[in-house]
């Protein structure tokens, strides 16, 4: 499975998360996953909620349309974006 997989109602992203980074950003490819740096610490679900909010802004969707399918407690996550309104250029480059 690749880092970005189109599905019937959106995109499935395989992510590697770097918490406590200096800024929020989509870094690029990290092995067979997309590396995402977020500023939130990995404590009490703060990193997950921050990740959902960040991805919602990047894809221009509501937070409820960003679903963490796998990896709730780890750095390696599988996230589904339902009906993205826009694709960030870092992700668009990986779908070609």
UniProtKB/Swiss-Prot annotation:
One matching Pfam family: DUF167
Cross-referenced InterPro entries: DUF167, YggU-like_sf
GO CC entries: cytoplasm
Superkingdom, natural source: Bacteria
Entry's family note: Belongs to the UPF0235 family.
Name of the protein in its database record: UPF0235 protein CKO_04329
